[in-house]
C-alpha cells in the first residue's frame, strides 16, 4: 500500500496537480496552494492507483457497502474506478437537482437502507461531501464511510467524524508536501 501511495503522490507531483500561488477554494477559504486531482484522474494508471488504494483501505478497515457514490465533478471518475474495482454499482450526486426531466439530484439507483461508500477527490472543510451525504440520506441510504484521495487537513476530518461518519483519507496533505520535499531534495543532489 505504501508503495502504491508513493507512486500516486509522485504522479500527482509530476502532473502538476499541486499548484502554489493564491487560490480561493470551494469552501471559500484562501490558500497558498491548490490540489487539482482532476489533473491526474485523466491518467488511467493514477486512476487505477486511486481505486486500488481506496478499495484496499475500505477492506482493511472492514467497511461493508452496497454502492459507491461520488459528488460531481471531481469525484465522478474516482468513484467510477472504485465501482469497477469493487464491482459495486455507481451513484453520481449532482450539486443541484436537474432543472429538466426528472429533476433528480442523483444518477443511479439508491434504495432504502443501501450502505454507501462516498468518495471525494479533495476535502478541506468537508462541506461539499457532507452535502452529498445529506442528499443520499434523504433517499434512505446510509453512509458506510467517506473516502477521500487527498485531505487538506483543514477541518474536514473533524466535521465528518462529528456527524458520525467514518473518514478514510488515502493521502493527507502533510504526506504529499513531505514527499514533494523529499523528491525535490533528491533532484538537487
From Swiss-Prot:
Keyword Transferase belongs to the record: yes
Role noted for this protein: Catalyzes the transfer of a ribosyl phosphate group from 5-phosphoribose 1-diphosphate to orotate, leading to the formation of orotidine monophosphate (OMP).
Pathway the protein acts in: Pyrimidine metabolism; UMP biosynthesis via de novo pathway; UMP from orotate: step 1/2
Protein's name in the database: Orotate phosphoribosyltransferase
Amino acids binding orotate: 124, 152
Quaternary structure, from the entry: Homodimer.
Keywords: Glycosyltransferase, Magnesium, Pyrimidine biosynthesis, Transferase
The enzyme's E.C. designation: 2.4.2.10
GO biological process, one term: pyrimidine nucleobase biosynthetic process
Pfam families per the UniProt record, alphabetical: Pribosyltran
Family as reported in the entry's similarity comment: Belongs to the purine/pyrimidine phosphoribosyltransferase family. PyrE subfamily.
SUPFAM superfamilies in UniProt: PRTase-like (SSF53271)
Co-factor requirement: Mg(2+)
Nucleotidyltransferase among keywords: no
Top-level taxon of origin: Archaea
GO MF terms held by the record: magnesium ion binding; orotate phosphoribosyltransferase activity
UniProt organism field: Thermococcus gammatolerans (strain DSM 15229 / JCM 11827 / EJ3)
Primary enzyme class: transferase
Swiss-Prot/TrEMBL catalytic activity: orotidine 5'-phosphate + diphosphate = orotate + 5-phospho-alpha-D-ribose 1-diphosphate
Disulfide bond annotation, renumbered to this chain: none
